[in-house]
């Protein structure tokens, strides 16, 4: 099991998205109150997008000072910037285009046809450099200590674009290019476990019965090379936020909190 992971189960995907949104707002407000700014790493996927839409629709959305927030992505599809496959595009449509973010603090990963000359390795290196430039001495590493790092969960246990037994699962750099990805599109850029584990809090968010086996394996002692989600651990806190379907295969003895 991911060391110290907390498991919270909500009734269905809709309630899960709203609960994640409420947690995001509360955590960002608390971080800004304590240190003036905050940082958030976004994920793609259906439940990730639903959570961002729920943030936008929340009555408390303006409690966050969006101009004092650094926004990152855990992974990105290396396609044209206007492609519907881009996690960035989905996040902008769901939330970022509807709140007053500071464009200089929105750190999108590179895209095909952009300044990296269609080279995902160059895009990965440039993102790693950007991460390092934003790290402070008190972060004790080449990556900022993110307040929240959101991750989806693949049915085979992948997080970000780190797939089981893939080169990215063994990567020691903070950001890596991914080629021949088993899930389209095949070329991507991803934060590695080195970067993920630098976050203060890592939240794995999953809905649907097709995620149940992956959640069970990750929370029952699987290795992070075989089940990358097992290595998604925050420095201070690791949260697994699931709907009942995604939690349906968890072992009976696993501690969890269930909402009505």
What annotation goes with each model-predicted range?
Residues 54-65, 89, 93, 164-173:
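A glycine- and small-aliphatic-rich helix-loop capping segment at beta-alpha/alpha-beta transitions
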Residues 2-4, 64-147:
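Ligand-binding beta-strand-loop-alpha-helix segment within the catalytic cores
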Residues 1-40, 121:
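N-terminal glycine-/serine-/threonine-rich phosphate-binding loop
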Residues 148-194:
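Class I SAM-dependent methyltransferase SAM-binding "motif I" and its flanking Rossmann-like core
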Residues 194, 200-260:
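ATP/nucleoside-binding phosphotransfer catalytic cores, i.e., glycine-rich phosphate-binding loops
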Residues 42-47, 151-155, 207:
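Glycine-rich beta-strand-to-loop/alpha-helix junction loops that act as flexible
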Residues 29-59:
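Glycine-rich N-terminal segment of FAD-binding domains in flavoprotein oxidoreductases
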Residues 60-70, 99-101, 168-169, 194-199, ...:
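Short, conserved loop/helix-junction motifs that constitute active-site signature segments
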């Amino acid at each position: 099991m991911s060391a110290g992971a907390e498991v919270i189960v909500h009734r269905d995907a809709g309630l899960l998205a709203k609960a994640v949104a409420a947690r995001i707002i509360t955590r960002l407000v608390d971080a800004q109150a304590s240190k003036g700014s905050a940082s958030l790493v976004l994920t793609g996927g259906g439940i990730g997008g639903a959570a961002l839409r729920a943030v936008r629709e929340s009555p408390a959305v303006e409690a966050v000072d969006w101009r004092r927030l650094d926004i990152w992505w855990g992974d990105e599809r290396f396609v044209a910037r206007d492609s519907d496959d881009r996690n960035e595009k989905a996040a902008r449509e769901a939330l970022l285009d509807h709140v007053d973010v500071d464009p200089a603090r929105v750190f999108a990963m590179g895209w095909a046809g952009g300044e990296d000359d269609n080279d995902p390795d160059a895009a990965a290196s440039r993102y790693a450099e950007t991460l390092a430039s934003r790290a402070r001495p008190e972060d004790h590493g080449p990556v900022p200590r993110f307040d929240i790092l959101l991750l989806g969960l693949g049915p085979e246990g992948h997080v970000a674009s780190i797939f089981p037994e893939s080169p990215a699962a063994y990567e020691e750099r903070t950001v890596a290019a991914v080629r021949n990805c088993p899930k389209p599109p095949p070329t991507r850029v991803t934060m590695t476990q080195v970067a993920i584990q630098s976050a203060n809090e890592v939240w794995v968010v999953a809905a649907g019965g097709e995620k149940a086996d992956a959640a069970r394996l990750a929370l029952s002692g699987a290795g992070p090379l075989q089940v990358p989600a097992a290595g998604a651990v925050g420095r201070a806190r690791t949260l697994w936020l699931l709907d009942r379907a995604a939690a349906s295969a968890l072992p009976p003895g696993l501690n969890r909190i269930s909402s009505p």
